[in-house]
């Protein structure tokens, strides 16, 4: 499969010559060292040092993870001299899990450039044949390709098809004829090419790039090749594929075949071919022998040195609250708001006067205040625009013609500062996308919202492999917020628990923050604290359901204009207490109601 190197070189060279800003790659472990060295330009000495265990102070050591899971970034120079930035995402061993993460990274980079429909950051995803056909996250990621909230202008998919998945033959790993048939669901063109013909691979790569540029849609290259050795260093492949490996053992390498072709055409001599090989081998030997002379690591993969957040003053002025509230009733001329919704929007301006700011308005004040201060806000999830429980209404639909009105966009000059996205019905890829997005935009509040917290386990791979562990494994920081509706309120076992205990078990080494605010003002302060925290880390926020409309669960305007997040809210009405109960969320209001009932 080594022909993937000239294939990638051709794609990225084309991107550089077309003046694309950046090319971002997501790939598994197979061939990664080759890509790191020969495409991404990571120095051979640096790779040897990492395998020998020599690290500079503060350099990411990977927390025991394999060295080739680390990413890198740099500048790619084409043969013509044209250049483009290059980014290779860090990834776990879970095959294909990095795909939606990479798409989120690309979308964030495009949003930062903020040139509409330019798509000048290009994603490339590498796959194995068995995993491309077998892993459902591929279907989810392909489905994102033309959705407005996720579009990245077309991805070039390269399937390194070695015709085996560890020990599993194609007849056991897929029903379809080709491993790439999954791409038919989006009508993506698929180019099948012989991996033993590097020039054909380069030609196909250039065609795929032109297709992506012309149509801004996904395109797939199926590079048919083979795995010369086992799945890993200690594997014996002939146990399970004896006939295949009898053929492979007798087969000359791709390099040998191509060198013979060049010699046969008279492009190089036999002596020149041998000399090239010997010189490169000698160069590697010299670098390896000097491996203790540590080369500087890319600063992107150093453990970020950041101070912990202070108890920041997260309050805002009453004028800012009023300005945000005014957006909720500034209905565009000729816009027809649903008659049941209009009173709810009008009530939001009254709430700030009578001290009954509910959760929906508390959210609105939170997002509006961050927008005013220059922080982009991106909220994505199933039914996120209205809110699962019809409390948010961040985007209002004209009941006559279906036009959209996003009230909070009135606070910013650039509408790309505020995205509220109704996601596809996915957890895995949808959460992965937002995680990737958050790693690139530290200034933004990025929220993935579960329809119910119970459903977040559909994205457990993202939670385990990225959200909770990326900092320790790769030095990668994210400030994603997982908003998970939680509470047993009569809707059955699949609509009751966000499984708080699981996230608490995942907490270690200050890897993430877990919160369950009890009032709208507490939500406001903790989100503003989170976005101002220089020690960026993910947050898991257990959001309410019945509290969204509970009259007791409201806040006064003073709770937003003074103070900060309260770690403990005391009860000033009680003296000489004989028992103290620590609680949060709906439990507090249940206890409060019961106490009031007993006092009657």
Give residue spans per PLM region.
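Conserved phosphate-handling catalytic cores of large alpha/beta enzymes
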Residues: 165-176, 184-220, 224-230, 238
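Short, charged/polar "capping" segments at the starts of alpha-helices
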Residues: 489-492, 549-550, 588-591
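A ubiquitous short alpha-helical element
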Residues: 241-248
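Conserved catalytic alpha/beta core of Sir2/sirtuin-type deacylases, generalized to analogous enzyme cores
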Residues: 536, 547-548, 553-577, 586
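Redox- and metal-dependent alpha/beta enzyme cores, enriched for Fe-S-associated oxidoreductases
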Residues: 576-600
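Glycine-rich beta-alpha junction loops
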Residues: 29-31, 225-230, 545-547, 585
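Conserved internal helical-beta-strand scaffold that buttresses enzyme catalytic cores
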Residues: 1-137, 142-175, 186, 190-191, ...
């Amino acid at each position: 499969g080594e022909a993937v190197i000239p294939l990638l070189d051709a794609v990225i060279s084309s991107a550089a010559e077309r003046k694309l800003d950046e090319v971002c790659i997501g790939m598994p472990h197979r061939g990664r060292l080759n890509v790191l060295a020969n495409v991404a330009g990571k120095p051979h000495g640096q790779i040897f040092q990492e395998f020998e265990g020599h690290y500079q102070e503060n350099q990411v050591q990977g927390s025991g993870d394999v060295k080739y899971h680390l990413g890198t970034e740099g500048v790619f120079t084409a043969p013509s001299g044209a250049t483009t930035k290059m980014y290779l995402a860090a990834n776990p061993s879970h095959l294909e899990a990095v795909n939606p993460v990479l798409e989120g990274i690309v979308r964030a980079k495009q949003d930062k450039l903020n040139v509409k429909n330019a798509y000048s950051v290009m994603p490339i995803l590498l796959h194995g044949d068995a995993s491309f056909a077998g892993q459902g996250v591929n279907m989810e990621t392909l489905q994102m390709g033309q959705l407005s909230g996720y579009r990245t202008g077309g991805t070039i998919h390269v399937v390194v098809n070695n015709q085996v998945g560890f020990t599993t033959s194609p007849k056991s790993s897929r029903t379809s004829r080709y491993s790439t048939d999954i791409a038919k669901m989006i009508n993506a063109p698929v180019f099948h090419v012989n991996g033993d013909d590097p020039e054909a691979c380069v030609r196909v790569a250039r065609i795929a790039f032109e297709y992506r540029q012309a149509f801004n849609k996904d395109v797939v290259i199926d590079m048919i090749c083979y795995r010369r050795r086992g799945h890993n260093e200690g594997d014996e492949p002939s146990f399970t594929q004896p006939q295949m490996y009898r053929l492979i053992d007798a087969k000359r390498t791709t390099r040998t075949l191509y060198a013979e072709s060049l010699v046969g055409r008279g492009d190089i001599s036999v002596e020149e071919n041998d000399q090239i090989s010997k010189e490169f081998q000698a160069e590697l030997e010299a670098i390896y022998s000097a491996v203790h002379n540590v080369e500087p690591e890319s600063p992107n993969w150093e453990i970020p040195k950041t101070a912990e957040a202070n108890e920041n003053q997260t309050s805002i002025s009453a004028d800012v609250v009023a300005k945000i509230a005014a957006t909720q009733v500034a209905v565009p001329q000729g816009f027809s708001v649903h008659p049941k919704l209009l009173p709810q929007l009008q009530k939001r301006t009254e709430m700030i006067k009578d001290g009954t700011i509910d959760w929906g308005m508390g959210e609105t004040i939170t997002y509006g205040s961050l927008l005013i201060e220059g922080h982009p806000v991106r909220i994505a999830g199933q039914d996120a625009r209205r809110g699962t429980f019809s409390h948010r209404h961040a985007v209002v639909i004209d009941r006559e013609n279906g036009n959209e009105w996003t009230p909070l966009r009135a606070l910013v000059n650039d509408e790309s500062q505020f995205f509220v996205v109704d996601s596809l019905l996915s957890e895995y890829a949808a959460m992965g996308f937002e995680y990737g997005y958050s790693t690139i935009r530290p200034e933004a509040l990025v929220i993935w919202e579960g329809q119910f917290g119970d459903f977040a386990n559909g994205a457990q791979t993202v939670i385990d492999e990225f959200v909770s562990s990326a900092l320790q494994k790769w030095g990668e920081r994210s400030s994603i917020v997982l908003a998970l509706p939680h509470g047993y309120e009569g809707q059955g076992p699949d609509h009751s628990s966000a499984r708080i205990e699981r996230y608490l078990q995942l907490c270690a080494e200050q890897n993430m923050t877990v919160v369950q605010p009890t009032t709208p003002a507490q939500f406001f302060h903790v989100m503003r604290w989170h976005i101002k925290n220089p020690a960026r880390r993910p947050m898991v926020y257990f959001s309410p359901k019945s509290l969204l409309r509970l009259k007791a669960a409201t806040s006064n305007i003073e709770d937003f204009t003074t103070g900060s997040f309260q770690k403990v809210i005391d009860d000033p009405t009680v003296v000489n207490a004989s028992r103290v109960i620590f609680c949060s969320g709906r439990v507090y209001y249940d206890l409060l109601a019961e106490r009031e009932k007993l006092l009657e």
